[in-house]
From Swiss-Prot:
Chain sites annotated for binding ATP: 8-15, 34, 123
Lineage per the UniProt record: Bacteria, Pseudomonadati, Pseudomonadota, Gammaproteobacteria, Moraxellales
Alphabetically ordered keywords of this record: ATP-binding, Cytoplasm, Disulfide bond, Nucleotide-binding, RNA-binding, Transferase, tRNA processing, tRNA-binding
Predominant location category: cytoplasm
Site (Interaction with tRNA): 124, 350
Swiss-Prot/TrEMBL GO biological process terms: tRNA wobble position uridine thiolation
Active site: 99, 201
Top-tier EC class: transferase
GO molecular function, a single term: tRNA binding
The gene coding this protein: mnmA
Species this protein is from: Acinetobacter baumannii (strain ACICU)
HAMAP family: tRNA_thiouridyl_MnmA (MF_00144)
Region described as Interaction with tRNA: spans on this chain: 151-153, 315-316
Name the record gives this protein: tRNA-specific 2-thiouridylase MnmA
Amino acid sequence: MQQRVIVGMSGGVDSSVSAALLLQQGYQVEGLFMKNWEEDDGTEYCTAMEDLADAQAVADKIGIKLHTANFAMEYWDRVFEHFLAEYAAGRTPNPDILCNKEIKFRAFLDHAMTLGADFIATGHYARRAETAYNSKGEAYAPLLRGLDKNKDQTYFLHAVHGREINKTLFPVGEIEKPEVRRIAEELDLATAKKKDSTGICFIGERRFNDFLKQYLPAQPGKIVLDNGKEVGEHHGLMYYTLGQRGGIGLGGMKGASEGAWFVLHKDVANNRLVVGQGHDHPLMQSTQLWSEAIDWVAGEQNIPAEGLRCTAKTRYRQPDQACTVFIDENSEHGVRVEFDEPQRAVTPGQSVVFYSDEVCLGGGVIHHTNAPTPNFI
């Protein structure tokens, strides 16, 4: 009997080709287009209608049914409110990670199961291993890096539990992006030459600062140098991220060298932005970080007393960094991570993701690091 797969179709080339490949592999395939954001300003920032039309055109071309579902309420409650709270606290969140965990691999998966699916599929560049069992006897599928290392998206999928991965197929995870484009052109799919989406879907083409301002009141404050000297005013700490180069408004400052300016530290308590010159400024360097809650793909991870040796990324596309992970005795589910080499601009609110060779073990949100605090704070 044919197994039924419902593909999350976004109107992009990766999910389009995923659906086509699954058909070729003999599955009974249907598509589902998710609407995760309600337009409220009457303008076409988000291309949701265009994306739906593209998904429908592909579904018609390959001869499959396309369902639609509205998860805007779930998105607001489970993703967007957290996104705003993190920015309000001076951190820099990554909503794509939470969206995958709560919407694409929870709300969508649950909905697909009510439609009678055996599996869901997405256009992510990732792979899964055969079903395994953790120490509690729970079935899960280990998450593996995508074959195309330049496009691998496991960083964004690390918070998805292995039991959900066990119900998911990743057709394009087994091939490289140029091949995906070639297949789409060969099949004459409407999305063959469509640009990859960038940015967060609910912001679309808007300037990020303008969007954020609609939801959080800006709190301007002082810009200070690494010695505490005031040199200007910032528009609100939420608009800046650690390690950011430029966009600070200090170009041509009297008495300063011609070098670029970088965000070194956010003094949230005093609403001050600390800046300085030098790509590898000491205030941006850390060798340890702490995360208060880790999502392990297997639902668990044995961490010996001497620590777990693995590699980690603290941002997407960063080369793997050798590290040791320890249980943090001061938090119920947290870890402390020691890196072999100093790390630059590790950012609270972003995620640290752990790997053992090809296997993505899981990860968590960075709470704080041991980067030095400016001595005037």
